């Protein structure tokens, strides 16, 4: 990365591009592991949005006459790896769903931070079109996070807590 804000912006944009590509691979696995129909639906809906996020980033690259390419995003890779380890755990369905929500929200919070920075930098550099495109994605990431919060607080976390305290019965 060179020493100018534009260069840092492009570097961050490439990181976000790779993060979205990694999430396109991870979200179907998360949807498959989810047992709550609402959670499964939330992951599937966000997968569709994520394809749109990739397209928007490509539009930003094009608007700035920059090559469309990613840079491996170690941050999202680590978050996805943590999510994979959750899916390999032997837990009850409610706990699995609660843990999947937590993993999904970690990814959303990472993306919210990244897109917040990208929007601010784009505006500061006078890249209005890029800022608007990235703001649209930022708004969708915040909405996805809010939806996961509603699912967690709307019963999934309580069901997981109740399952943890229910007596074990022999089959």
Regions found by a protein language model. Give the residues of each.
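Amphipathic alpha-helical hairpins
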Residues: 1-171
């Amino acid at each position: 990365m060179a020493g100018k804000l534009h260069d840092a912006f492009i570097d961050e944009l490439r990181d976000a591009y790779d993060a979205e590509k990694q999430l396109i691979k991870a979200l179907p696995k998360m949807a498959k592991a989810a047992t709550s129909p609402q959670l499964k639906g939330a992951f599937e809906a966000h997968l569709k949005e994520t394809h749109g996020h990739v397209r928007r980033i490509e539009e930003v690259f094009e608007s700035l006459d920059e090559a469309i390419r990613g840079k491996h995003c170690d941050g999202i890779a680590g978050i996805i790896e943590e999510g994979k380890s959750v899916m390999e755990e032997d837990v009850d369905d409610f706990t699995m769903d609660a843990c999947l929500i937590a993993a999904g929200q970690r990814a959303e919070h990472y993306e919210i931070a990244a897109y917040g920075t990208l929007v601010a930098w784009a505006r500061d550099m006078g890249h209005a079109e890029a800022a608007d495109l990235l703001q649209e994605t930022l708004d969708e990431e915040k909405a996805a996070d809010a939806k996961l919060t509603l699912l967690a607080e709307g019963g999934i976390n309580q069901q997981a807590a109740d399952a943890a305290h229910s007596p074990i019965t022999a089959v």
